[in-house]
């Protein structure tokens, strides 16, 4: 390399020109941003920027150190990876204590129809674009761009899976990304929820199965989570009307708000199959869903790299298209006794409010959770 005086001078002059151009480009970008923020459409951008700035300080991708179970700060990449793996492996393979079910339930043996093209089209339409891909690196946009050729191929593929009750082995792998809950210590693993990045093609398969299950399974009216045309607003309105009626009648109404701890992660698989069968789901679909959970494996992607792979043997898949409705089925069956004793019990996913005219009845219903394996989060109940 020629380090002559002329070359050094030319290099410095080039540096100054680049800095001036970068400064001009920044100023232009800021001017355009400020102009947009002054408009009605720019309000969303303003809130998005504020949220992003807050999130950057708490994002797992920015947090390169983490605490172990005893509160000691880990700094080496190897120890941080080991801690993330230890935490999620324990979380996703630990069941709450519960009473084992002794009663059997009759399985529904019936023939199921083949997957139709219109079902695949609807599933494709429901899939959002621009989402993070799973280990196979195939985004849903690929199938959307292929149009009818994709519909033809996927319909054939899904029918083979339905017939054999075996999905491709690659779909059993996932990448788990810790997402900060925006509360508590940013260096504590327990303040993160894990979202699995799964194959988009598997999610299409899940949506086809979910659409069929929704047609045969009737979820109770008291469940407001994961149900079409229902929201927290409806649950709040119903509870408010109930309280006003009792106040007008000068009668007692006892309400207990219950948050189930790690309910999504610790649903026993056997409980899932039991609840599906009790809800009248055809045995064919039960076996298909069982196959989705068989030999499932994941790795944790954190700021310092990727952990070693481990098995996931308990709970529902976070980030799955089918899991929300499966959870609704489980909660529907597990809360059946509560709803019979306290007909005003309301649920939004795993958040429950038990209402009764007597305190004794409320306390009795709370004990049912111990039998079903659902553990209360005492800090939020």
Regions of interest found by a model, annotated:
Residues 209-223, 324-357:
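Active-site palm subdomain of RNA-directed nucleic acid polymerases
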Residues 159, 194, 210, 263-287:
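Catalytic-core region of right-hand nucleic acid polymerases
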Residues 65, 130-138, 187-197, 234-274:
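Conserved catalytic palm subdomain of right-hand nucleotidyl-transferase polymerases, strongest
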Residues 110, 304-306, 379-381:
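Short, conserved micro-motifs composed of acidic
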Residues 36-190, 196, 200:
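Surface-exposed loop/turn segments and immediately adjacent short secondary-structure elements
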Residues 18, 88, 120, 124, ...:
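Mobile genetic element proteins and their domesticated derivatives, centered on retroelements
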Residues 262-279, 352-374:
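Catalytic palm subdomain of template-directed nucleic-acid polymerases
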Residues 7-26, 147:
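Short amphipathic alpha-helical coiled-coil/interface segments
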């Amino acid at each position: 390399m020629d380090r002559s005086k002329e070359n050094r001078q030319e290099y410095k002059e080039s540096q100054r020109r680049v800095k001036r151009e970068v400064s001009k480009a920044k100023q232009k970008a800021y001017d355009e941003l400020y102009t947009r923020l002054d408009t009605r459409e720019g309000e969303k951008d303003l809130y998005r920027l504020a949220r992003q700035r807050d999130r950057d300080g708490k994002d797992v991708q920015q947090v390169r150190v983490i605490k172990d179970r005893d509160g000691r700060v880990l700094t080496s990449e190897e120890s941080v990876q080991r801690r993330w793996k230890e935490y999620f492996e324990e979380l996703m393979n630990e069941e709450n204590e519960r009473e084992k079910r002794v009663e059997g339930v009759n399985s529904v043996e019936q023939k199921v129809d083949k997957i139709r093209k219109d079902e695949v089209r609807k599933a494709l339409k429901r899939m959002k674009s621009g989402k993070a891909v799973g280990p196979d690196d195939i985004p849903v946009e690929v199938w959307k761009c292929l149009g009818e050729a994709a519909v033809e191929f996927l319909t054939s593929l899904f029918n083979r899976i339905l017939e054999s009750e075996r999905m491709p082995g690659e779909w059993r792998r996932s990448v788990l990304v810790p997402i900060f809950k925006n509360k508590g210590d940013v260096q504590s693993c327990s303040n993160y929820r894990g979202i699995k990045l799964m194959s988009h093609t598997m999610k299409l398969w899940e949506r086809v199965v979910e659409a069929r299950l929704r047609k045969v399974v009737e979820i109770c009216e008291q469940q407001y989570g994961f149900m079409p045309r229902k929201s927290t607003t409806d649950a709040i309105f119903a509870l408010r009307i109930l309280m006003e009626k009792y106040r007008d009648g000068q009668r007692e109404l006892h309400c207990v708000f219950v948050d189930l701890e790690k309910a999504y992660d610790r649903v026993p698989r056997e409980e899932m199959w039991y609840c599906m069968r009790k809800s009248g789901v055809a045995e064919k679909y039960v076996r298909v869903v069982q196959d989705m959970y068989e030999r499932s494996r994941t790795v944790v992607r954190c700021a310092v790299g990727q952990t070693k792979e481990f098995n996931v043997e308990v709970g529902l898949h976070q980030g799955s298209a089918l899991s929300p409705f499966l959870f609704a089925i489980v909660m529907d069956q597990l809360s059946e006794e509560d709803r019979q004793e306290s007909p005003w019990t309301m649920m939004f996913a795993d958040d429950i409010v038990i209402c009764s005219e007597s305190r004794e009845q409320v306390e009795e219903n709370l004990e049912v959770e111990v039998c079903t394996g659902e553990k209360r989060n005492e800090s939020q109940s």
